[in-house]
Amino acid sequence: MGLHLGLIDYGMGNLHSVEKAFNRLGHQPSRVVNPSDLDGCDALVLPGVGSFDPAIDNLQSTGLIPDLKRWNEADRPLLGICLGLQLLFESSAEGRLEGLGLIKGHVERLPIGAGARIPHMGWAPLDLRRANPMLAAADPLAWVYFVHSYAAVPERPETLAAAASFGSSSVTAMVWQRRLGACQFHPEKSSDSGSAMLKRWLDWLQRGAPIG
């Protein structure tokens, strides 16, 4: 039996490009627009493009927030992408609403004095800090595509899975916490590197999403 992926549709995600990326890997995600759509899902993908507060507002309107928290408490796989990563944290300097709080920490604006233009837009190599279901230490250097003005700051250092350079600073590129992971970059727009990472995540799910 194949994996049943749920793609959370709350009106602010780049759903079409994410769907196409999974289609190329032989998977057809189902769109999740309300709690009943979670039935039968093996793993969830939370994409996102836009601003923090409108995204939280939209998620609240779907009624999915309590279910996403229960999903995480049950240690079930979830992958956040771009704004989807930021929503996993407790709060953001971009807005006033509470985040999902699935990962301890906050989202802050990229540093103005780092000698780089905001938004951070374009390709950058990943600095792997901890092997995870999307990226292993033996993998080739991964160049990935970013578009963002804010970056997460995890409270626990071990949550940081990969970083990227932003001028003279280093910012969060990936986080991982048991079966909950996320990337600030867009794997669906990151050519072969992004496709390889999504495939690795799918293979991990097929193996039962082992921890460690």
UniProtKB/Swiss-Prot annotation:
Catalytic-site annotation from UniProt: 82, 186, 188
Pathway per the UniProt entry: Amino-acid biosynthesis; L-histidine biosynthesis; L-histidine from 5-phospho-alpha-D-ribose 1-diphosphate: step 5/9
UniProt key word Secreted: no
Subunit structure: Heterodimer of HisH and HisF.
InterPro entries: Class_I_gatase-like, GATASE, Imidazole-glycPsynth_HisH
Function: IGPS catalyzes the conversion of PRFAR and glutamine to IGP, AICAR and glutamate. The HisH subunit provides the glutamine amidotransferase activity that produces the ammonia necessary to HisF for the synthesis of IGP and AICAR.
GO cellular component term of the entry, any: cytoplasm
GO MF, one annotated term: glutaminase activity
Protein name, entry field: Imidazole glycerol phosphate synthase subunit HisH 2
Organism of this sequence: Parasynechococcus marenigrum (strain WH8102)
Domain Glutamine amidotransferase type-1: 4-211
EC code(s) of this entry: 4.3.2.10, 3.5.1.2
Gene Ontology biological process terms from the UniProt entry: L-histidine biosynthetic process
Gene: hisH2
Record-linked PANTHER family: IMIDAZOLE GLYCEROL PHOSPHATE SYNTHASE SUBUNIT HISH
